[in-house]
């Protein structure tokens, strides 16, 4: 017979263990009646399958000041024999949010699923003009979604959803740069997400892509987004490229659903979401040199990075003084990496348009 590929078995066993449902996963090879039988030996966690998780985010930059967020999530897994899950989340801090989600596979292999979810969010949106923060709006809303989809093994997922939404976009402080909105609408959403990056943040190899399309006859617009990223390593140097398009195949994107530029590795010279607009195209490439590891207790490599970015905005909603600029540019240098608590980085971005930004997360 064929030689046993132990490396493939080890990889699949690690993937099963990585699901988080098992205390241990092992395997053994048995010989019965001139046949070799591979037996997988999973042991379910005795303390599961319920999980309570917490996350803390702290960031600051020279244009927006500091913000923070504390998030808690309760996940109840394996609520039936097909692997149904319930996820409840709540977030407080500079932004507020809460959500409840039910995910139900339709077959033992979990190739097909249905999902229902409801969420509320209240986000502070700073409005910029001439690189100065001139107003702050509150972008809040509630959304209910019913979805059906399919999983492509470890490659990714495709889903089709019907979404009911209500949105409020109201000025909180500052000048009236944008009109207030209060609206309710519904529509279809199709999404394809494929991910083969070897890490969630600061990957060293692989690729990912996301295609997202939302169409609402009620609101009179459609929103399309394409996001592609790839990474590879040359020794201790990691090269990563990313491209994104956000636009409106039908109508014009409303302010509360606009494309966004600004923030770390999304035109780093600008503050987070400093530029709102429609028909936005972005491309960026960065090189990172692994220069060491984080101090004791913090796993992960430490990197010194340099990024070059460019973008074109068809219609500006903020920073309208840039409307005559064909291509926006940004360059950034930073120090950071991935830790058990998430990504951490410190850096500086600059654009020849006059924008600059120190950032820490």
Give the location of each predicted region.
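N-terminal periplasmic "start-of-domain" segments of outer-membrane beta-barrel proteins
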Residues: 1-2
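Gram-negative/organellar outer-membrane beta-barrel architecture
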Residues: 5-201, 231, 235, 259-268, ...
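C-terminal transmembrane beta-barrel domains of outer membrane proteins
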Residues: 71, 87-88, 101, 207-361
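Face-selective signature of the C-terminal outer-membrane beta-barrel domain
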Residues: 156, 162-164, 205-215
